[in-house]
Amino acid sequence: MKTVRESTTLYNFLGSHNPYWRLTESSDVLRFSTTETTEPDRTLQLSAEQAARIREMTVITSSLMMSLTVDESDLSVHLVGRKINKREWAGNASAWHDTPAVARDLSHGLSFAEQVVSEAHSAIVILDSRGNIQRFNRLCEDYTGLKEHDVIGQSVFKLFMSRREAAASRRNNRVFFRSGNAYEVELWIPTCKGQRLFLFRNKFVHSGSGKNEIFLICSGTDITEERRAQERLRILANTDSITGLPNRNAMQDLIDHAINHADNNKVGVVYLDLDNFKKVNDAYGHLFGDQLLRDVSLAILSCLEHDQVLARPGGDEFLVLASNTSQSALEAMASRILTRLRLPFRIGLIEVYTSCSVGIALSPEHGSDSTAIIRHADTAMYTAKEGGRGQFCVFTPEMNQRVFEYLWLDTNLRKALENDQLVIHYQPKITWRGEVRSLEALVRWQSPERGLIPPLDFISYAEESGLIVPLGRWVILDVVRQVAKWRDKGINLRVAVNISARQLADQTIFTALKQVLQELNFEYCPIDVELTESCLIENDELALSVIQQFSQLGAQVHLDDFGTGYSSLSQLARFPIDAIKLDQVFVRDIHKQPVSQSLVRAIVAVAQALNLQVIAEGVESAKEDAFLTKNGINERQGFLFAKPMPAVAFERWYKRYLKRA
């Protein structure tokens, strides 16, 4: 009878035997409606304690019994429900003894939750405080081959962990249950697909009904393939694609690790740069060059100890890391590598030689991190290359001066081009008759910081950096303008300018030269060009094209520094050259070594046979001049006649010279 009475009271007050209830976070008023979709039409004021009990409900459907005051009568009800969002709790109410209604509401709510857990795309395991399995969803079954009803109540530690892992996990589990904080963990789990890596996002929840128990909900995502993809990307990011060796990034990490764990032992870095690799690459193509890099890497590896690491930071450079080493050991290694790389490499039917230059640096004396020690090994390598290639150098602090000088030149030579700090000096050439018909233009740098800088101090850097191209173009055009000024004063002379190998590819110079000749009303080209023998060797086809284009403009072509480089009679016959310049080393030794006199006579004889003019440079004494004139030299230049001088100074010198003549 009590059940009927309570149910009738509930119906009379709320209009339903099983009304829908709702409680918000901001109010302790319990709102009722006949169904979930209708607006609340009845309310009951709860005590703070009653409201707090309802707010303890979680997202998992649960029930609690509560005594409510309805129409001044006490009514015991079952509230079945859950937390439906961040700020609301809702469910159904039934009279305390209406067991079928309570069971129906619980079944409805729990069946929904069960379906969500079962069909989720995560492996969901619910554990109690002892680590026993309470839920084991379908994805867990698929991965493990175990059924939920077989594992319920069993220890997760025994089923899926080794003894050592289980002991550690039990300790951690007790700590986590005490703190109640959510956490994430990555675990390797044995599955039907082998060992798989799962990321578990773990959260603690209260049972919400009956005995207040705490459960751990573990939601796991299989991240095995994601981690493998990340590892592949990591390997790609740290591996040279051509040789398979570690790249610069990887090597820097390895060097830093070696230095940090050196324990007072020395760590060495050896920097290798292949000589003439670019020429091989240009001649035979990139596929050939790539194969050569692979073969070279194998050759270098054959010279290393088992614990030494080879890397390719890029281009034609290699790095070797040696831990627990010494300077003598690194020098011995460098010698082995140099000896091996002097042997030819055969790729297909082609045999090539590629030596290398080697720099050595050690930690701690040359640097305490990878950046410093690599930089110093690089500096030592460039010192070895400048010293003649095919050798090694150990870094010394004095070598840094080269780096500082390079940086100073890199900054200030660019400013010099922009701010008109370059000037041209002219040195006259005297014919065997004593006439001045031509000059040589020699560039100088009037630095505000260092004063007048000779070309030997900056031309090599200009060639290395590529600044020689705009610098050379400026020289040619400025010389033409100066010759035009002299022409207007009645001084008609030709001027020779030097062209380097880097300038040969600058086809814009011909257009610019044509344009300035037209602007200044020249009917002829007053410019002669001086090419070194190395220009002809490095790219003979391009050199031939350049010579022909200058010749078409009316310029004469002189072969500079003849006899000091790669001279051959075939070059003199092939290239349309107008004159050869006898290098000053022959002139200087004329009266010191009899063989020099014979060489000069032979060179003059060959030139005359080919109808070429011969110009001697570096003439400093009357005795030298007499020998050269007697043996058929057409023009001479040197300090005996005049030093290089600015254009204004040359005009004064020229007027005095004409008066003496």
Swiss-Prot record:
Q: What happens when the gene is disrupted?
A: Leads to overproduction of curli fimbrae and autoaggregation in cultures grown at 28 degrees Celsius.
Q: Which SUPFAM superfamilies match?
A: EAL domain-like (SSF141868), Nucleotide cyclase (SSF55073), PYP-like sensor domain (PAS domain) (SSF55785)
GO molecular-function term, one example from the UniProt record: cyclic-guanylate-specific phosphodiesterase activity
The UniProt induction remark is:
Constitutively expressed at both 28 and 37 degrees Celsius, during transition into stationary phase, more highly expressed on plates than in liquid medium. Expression is RpoS dependent and repressed by H-NS.
Q: Which reaction does it catalyse?
A: 3',3'-c-di-GMP + H2O = 5'-phosphoguanylyl(3'->5')guanosine + H(+)
GO biological process, alphabetically ordered: post-transcriptional regulation of gene expression
Q: EC annotation?
A: 3.1.4.52
GGDEF domain residues: 265-397
Q: Which keywords belong to this entry?
A: c-di-GMP, Hydrolase
Domain PAS residue range list: 109-179
Q: List the SMART domains hit by this protein, alphabetically.
A: EAL, GGDEF, PAS
The record's listing under Pfam families reads: EAL (PF00563), GGDEF (PF00990), PAS_9 (PF13426)
Enumerate the spans annotated as EAL domain: 406-658
Judging by the UniProt lineage, the source's domain of life is Bacteria
Record note on quaternary structure: Interacts with DgcM and MlrA.
Please explain the role this protein plays, according to its UniProt record. Answer: Part of a signaling cascade that regulates curli biosynthesis. The cascade is composed of two cyclic-di-GMP (c-di-GMP) control modules, in which c-di-GMP controlled by the DgcE/PdeH pair (module I) regulates the activity of the DgcM/PdeR pair (module II), which in turn regulates activity of the transcription factor MlrA and expression of the master biofilm regulator csgD. PdeR acts as a trigger enzyme that connects modules I and II. It inhibits DgcM and MlrA by direct interaction. Inhibition is relieved when PdeR binds and degrades c-di-GMP generated by module I.
Name of the protein this chain belongs to: Cyclic di-GMP phosphodiesterase PdeR
Native source species:
Escherichia coli (strain K12)
Highest classification ranks of the organism: Bacteria, Pseudomonadati, Pseudomonadota, Gammaproteobacteria, Enterobacterales
